[in-house]
């Protein structure tokens, strides 16, 4: 698993095969970003954006967003073991600023008053 585009292009993302969490395949990720960045209907730019990555897993989607210019990412992952691997990915890639890693149930997280706009 790797980062497809942007300033971190080609960098590897750690993941564990021994968990039930499945990483987002590169081909699927590439299709998602092609739709997001090239659709005239959506008109989305990741530059300086604030992204909420729910069910983050190993961070593949959020890390791709950072690589493509997102300014802030909030990762939400329930599984503490998976969250540790995500944190390792952030440290290995040298990503420190604009990152929030929340280890919590998604429904609980979304039921809170969110002060950020995503």
Language model feature labels by segment:
Residues 1-63, 68, 84-117:
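S-adenosyl-L-methionine
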């Amino acid at each position: 698993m790797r980062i497809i585009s942007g300033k971190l292009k080609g960098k590897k993302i750690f993941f564990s095969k021994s968990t039930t969490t499945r990483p987002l395949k590169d081909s699927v990720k590439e299709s998602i970003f092609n739709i997001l960045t090239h659709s005239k209907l959506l008109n989305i730019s990741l530059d300086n954006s604030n992204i909420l990555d729910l069910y983050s897993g190993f961070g593949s989607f959020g890390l791709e967003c950072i690589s493509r210019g997102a300014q802030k990412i909030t990762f939400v992952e329930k599984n503490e073991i998976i969250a540790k691997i995500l944190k390792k990915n952030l440290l290995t890639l040298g990503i420190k600023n604009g990152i929030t890693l929340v280890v919590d149930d998604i429904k609980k997280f979304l039921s809170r008053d969110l002060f950020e706009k995503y």
